Regions:
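Bacterial N-terminal signal peptides that target proteins for export
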Residues: 1-9
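Cleavable N-terminal signal peptides
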Residues: 11, 21-22
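Histidine-centered copper-binding motifs that mark active-site loops
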Residues: 23-270, 274-296, 335-372
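Short, hydrophobic beta-strand segments
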Residues: 112-118, 302-310
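Short acidic/polar inter-strand loop motif in beta-rich domains
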Residues: 130-136, 312, 320-327
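Ligand-binding face of N-terminal immunoglobulin V-set domains in extracellular IgSF glycoproteins
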Residues: 299
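Thr-biased low-complexity repeat/linker tracts and other Thr-enriched repetitive architectures
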Residues: 365-415
Length: 415
């Protein structure tokens, strides 16, 4: 063998060894089971992961080789886990019926293996039946390599996941059955005749008649802000009364990684008397945007930096239909004990408009339209598929998605 060839082979082996050493293998075992949980004071059977409700935080660094063994201990249900927002091979995506993945049968194990090719705030959840609603969801955070901050604006002294979710006393199967009986089954804050009179006084009889006729043609209510109501809203799996708390010390910067893991609830998030700076959206860094409040849609994530000065702050995530709050606390650990939460007064209920529906025009003049709307090919009567409706609420004015890497630090969801 020539000296030149030997030299080339030696370099190749060295590079391979260097790459192999740098790529850490991060392994997790997740056991899916059904257990009794007590969230609202009533013991109920729900899905747990490793005995926890909600599922545990998974942490990686960019470049890791992820190995996640999922053990399905549900008695009569296939299961699955989808890694929301992650770039990975199709067979590892975790959606039954796609990419030759059939789900995980009862008492079987499936091993997810993939290279972690990005960083940011993400989450994971079931893609089987209504298991996500029943508890199979959890946070997932990927740090930059060696957890080195990428920009000065993202540097923080503390780093917390704030997982928002909704819990119902009915199972996902019961909820779906009710919605099949009546699409408006859970609309228990409907308008009354007095609302109609107020609209007539404000807009006039003709305009009111036209507006009401259009909503009737769509078979939809103006109050249909959320498909399901009677939820208890959670923060990191805790009710407002249980008061999830993130600690800090005076002068520290705190990163809050908000994840909306709800089944179908949107939230308006605020921390009274504390400005937030949005630094990331859906795992992607953005030009910093200072805000007093932001709206987070289902499955979205937003990272914010805060610089608390007071001893206590209340984190308030108000549901878009104004039916309740997910609440937690930021607390200076060097001060007096954490204060009890103060339940805010809900803001006035909003009503949908035709503009919200992408229908700010005269429907009655549309040629060939059957006014009962039932014959329109491909139209879902809950209007969720209508062009013009933004479901994920991800567009925030002034936000610049530059797709570059994020940074991150250790999380603490235990408090």
């Amino acid at each position: 063998m020539s000296r030149k060839l030997s030299h080339v082979l030696l370099i190749g082996v060295g590079l391979f060894s260097s790459t192999w050493v740098m790529a850490a293998v991060k392994e997790y075992d997740l056991t899916i089971a059904e257990q009794t949980v007590n969230i609202t004071g009533k013991p109920l059977k729900r899905i747990t992961v490793n005995g926890k409700f909600v599922a545990p935080l998974l942490e990686f660094e960019e470049g890791d080789d992820a190995v996640i063994r999922v053990h399905n201990k549900l008695k009569n249900q296939d299961s699955s886990i989808h890694w929301h927002g992650l770039i990975l091979p199709g067979i590892m995506d975790g959606v039954p019926g796609f990419n030759q993945f059939d789900g995980i049968a009862p008492n079987k194990t499936y091993e997810y293996k993939f290279k972690v090719r990005q960083n940011g705030t993400y989450w994971y959840h079931s893609h089987s039946k209504g298991q996500e609603q029943d508890g199979l969801y959890g946070p997932l955070v990927i740090y930059p390599k060696n957890k080195v901050p990428l920009t000065a604006g993202e540097k923080a002294d503390r780093d917390y996941v704030v997982l928002l979710s909704d819990f119902h006393n009915s199972t996902s199967g019961q909820i779906m059955s009710n919605l099949k009986k009546e699409a408006d089954y859970y609309q228990n804050r409907r308008e009354t005749v007095f609302d109609v009179f107020r609209q007539i006084k404000r807009d006039g009889l003709k305009a009111t008649w036209k507006d009401r006729s259009m909503w009737n043609q769509m078979r939809m209510l103006k109050t249909d802000m959320s498909d399901v109501t009677n939820y208890t809203f959670l923060m990191n799996g805790k009710t407002p009364e249980q008061n999830w708390t993130g600690n800090f010390k005076a002068g520290e910067k705190v990163r809050l990684r908000f994840i909306n893991a709800s089944a179908m609830s949107l939230f308006d998030v605020r921390i009274p008397n504390l400005k937030m700076t949005v630094v990331s959206a859906d795992g992607q860094p953005v030009k910093p945007v200072p805000v007093d409040e932001f709206r987070i849609g289902t499955a979205e994530t937003y990272d914010v930096i805060v610089e608390p000065k007071q001893a206590n702050y209340q984190i308030e995530a108000e549901s878009i239909d104004r039916s309740g709050f997910s609440i937690g606390t930021l607390h200076d650990e060097n001060t007096s004990p954490v204060k009890s939460i103060v339940m805010p007064t809900p803001r006035p209920r909003a009503l949908l408009t035709m503009e919200d529906m992408g229908m700010n025009h005269d429907m009655s003049s549309m040629k060939g339209m059957d006014h009962d709307m039932s014959s329109m090919k491909g139209m879902d009567h809950d209007m969720s598929s209508m062009k013009g409706m933004d479901h994920d609420m991800s567009s925030m004015k002034g936000m610049d998605h530059d797709m570059s890497s994020m940074k991150g630090m250790d999380h603490d969801m235990s408090s």
